[in-house]
Amino acid sequence: MRKHRNSNVVRLWAAGQAACSHTNNLYSMEDGSLWSYNLKIGQRTPAGVCVVADYMAPYFQSQTTSCHVSRAKGYADMVMNPLVWETSPMSEKGNL
């Protein structure tokens, strides 16, 4: 897979395409999921709705993940509180 800048990874995710950053720390998959390291931070539904978990303060994971979330929020149709996200089927690996 071709490597992309983080800004392009989230843009391609929102467009429904798989993509990976040059460090492999931010990536989107063909199932519509968006990952920061091993943490699922977003899901694009089959209808094309982009949902992002707001893993920023006070639900901070890492500085890098906060940067990834910040970029993804620019393309999000919905931003979820991480407590809601974690109980949602969208947060599960391989879902949707």
Segments and roles (model prediction):
Residues 1-96:
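Terminal leader/tail segments of proteins
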